[in-house]
Amino acid sequence: MATKDPTAVERANLLNMAKLSIKGLIESALSFGRTLDSDYPPLQQFFVVMEHCLKHGLKGRKSFLSYNKTIWGPLELVEKLYPEAEEIGASVRDLPGLKTPLGRARAWLRLALMQKKMADYLRCLIIQRELLSEFYEYHALMMEEEGAVIVGLLVGLNVIDANLCVKGEDLDSQVGVIDFSMYLKNEEEIGNKERNVQIAAILDQKNYVEELNRQLNSTVSSLHSRVDSLEKSNTKLIEELAIAKNNIIKLQEENHQLRSENELILMRTRQHLEVTKVDVETELQTYKHSRQGLDEMYNDARRQLRDESQLRQDVENELSVQVGMKHEMELAMKLLEKDIHEKQDTLIGLRQQLEEVKAINIEMYQRLQGSEDGLKEKNEIIARLEEKTNKITTAMRQLEQRLQQAEKAQKEAEAEDEKYAQECLSQSDSLQRQISQKEQQLVQLETDLKIEKEWRQTLQEDLQKEKDVLSHLRHETQKVISLKKEFLNLQDENQQLKRIYQEQEQALQELGSKLCESKLKIDDIKEANKALQGLVWLKDKDATHCKLCEKEFSLSKRKHHCRNCGEIFCNACSDNELPLPSSPKPVRVCDSCHAMLIQRCSSNMP
């Protein structure tokens, strides 16, 4: 028969033992029904089996004194491969009782089981065979398939809850021997199951009572700590109350002083406001007087405009009369048949005069267009006059047309003159008379035209006067605008003065508060000086006994000065602290001074 490889037989035996130990641990833990501790036998045997599995095929490391095999090296490698394992490595290194690498490895296995991550950690090791080859031989269990099978079996241990105390155990000196009797069935085991059930129930009751005892002890300790904290807070509150009473007395004095200062400031502000009101009223009166003068100027200008409008209405009436006269001239021109040439000369002269009138009207119109918005009414009147002149020009054009008709009639008349020469001779005397009358009418028209020229000159002079009045009004309006600007500037200066006044009031209030604080500090210093002058600081040599309890001082019973009265007391009679006027911080005070100062603070309270 062929001999088997002894290393393969060792691996198979270790695999079978691992299966039996893991299976027995899971079954017993589930039947046990509670968390496992370090004294549980199946759990101890499981760790022994795992230790043998990890030691199989481990390379020996030569040291100076001995030749050791340790499993801590590959387990320490897990930290680099699995970052979550850093906590286990750090906690194992921090354990004080462990001195050997084997003890650290055993503690590492127990912590990994409690975390339920032993299978994950060992799986990382098995995958990295190149790194494991530094620690294990090629035929080791961790390098072969049996190691992967054991890692798969370890996943079932996640069902178990274990609470192991690693600090108290002696993991360095334990002997790892596998107890095969646990895995061999006997008749006695069947009878002992009932005993184990009873023992488990008793252990459960024991654990329950221990947990209750722990909870009660924790509650009692927490209550003691609360009582101590409440006593300390009570003493602090009493001291703070005394300090608060002193502060309240000081604040009441400050309040009285501030009220008096506030009343003085109110009186000053009222006086200042009355003065400012009088100034504002005077400014308003001056503004009203200036406004009345401007209103009077405006009314005068309106009156002048009304007078000019009446004058222009009179001129329009005269123009209407002249238009009627021109109509009469048209009727007279029909009768002027023979003296057409002379009448043409006169008409040419009249045309020149009309062109001059038109040029004058155009100049007036241009000047009126250059005038400002305040002369719109005058522009409208001039436009009306221009319309009337246009009507006159149209009438003259009609006269020209009629003259052309008269020329035609003249030609016809020349033909008829030859026939009716005798009749004309008879009528010539009458016509000469009429011509003389027409000449007189022409003279009258020339005089009327001269009158119109003079009237237009007067209108131009009136326009210049109105322009002067407008310039004067503009100058006055500019003065009014400048006065308004000065008034606004004065208002801004008034507001700035008010702001400066308010800022000065705030500064005075702050100075008042600071002065009050300095006065209070000076009073406290004076009281402290008075207290120091009245007190006598007792020397250490002069005191041999406590003034209150009259116990003798020794090395254990030290001397303490009271900062208020200057006497020397023991620690028990001077275990009090209060703020004094001489020192803002709390200082040591004897019992009698402490009671006296608290009574004084309570009497000073309102």
UniProtKB/Swiss-Prot annotation:
Binding-site positions, Zn(2+) 1: C546, C549, C570, C573
A Pfam family hit: FYVE
Q: Where does Zn(2+) 2 bind?
A: C562, C565, C590, C593
Question: Which superkingdom is the protein from?
Answer: Eukaryota
Q: Which Gene3D superfamilies match?
A: 1.20.5.170, 1.20.58.900, Zinc/RING finger domain, C3HC4 (zinc finger)
**Chain positions of all zinc fingers (FYVE-type):** 540-598
What PROSITE patterns does the record tag this protein with?
RUN (PS50826), ZF_FYVE (PS50178)
Tell me which stretches of the chain form a coiled coil.
210-267, 294-515
KW Metal-binding (keyword) present: yes
Q: Where in the cell is it found?
A: Nucleus
Keywords attached to this entry: Coiled coil, Metal-binding, Nucleus, Zinc, Zinc-finger
| Residue intervals of the RUN domain | 37-169
| GO molecular function terms attached to this record | SH3 domain binding; zinc ion binding
Q: Which GO terms describe its cellular component?
A: cytoplasm; nucleus
Assembly information from the UniProt record:
Interacts with BMX.
Q: What is this protein called?
A: RUN and FYVE domain-containing protein 2
Which species is listed as the source? Mus musculus
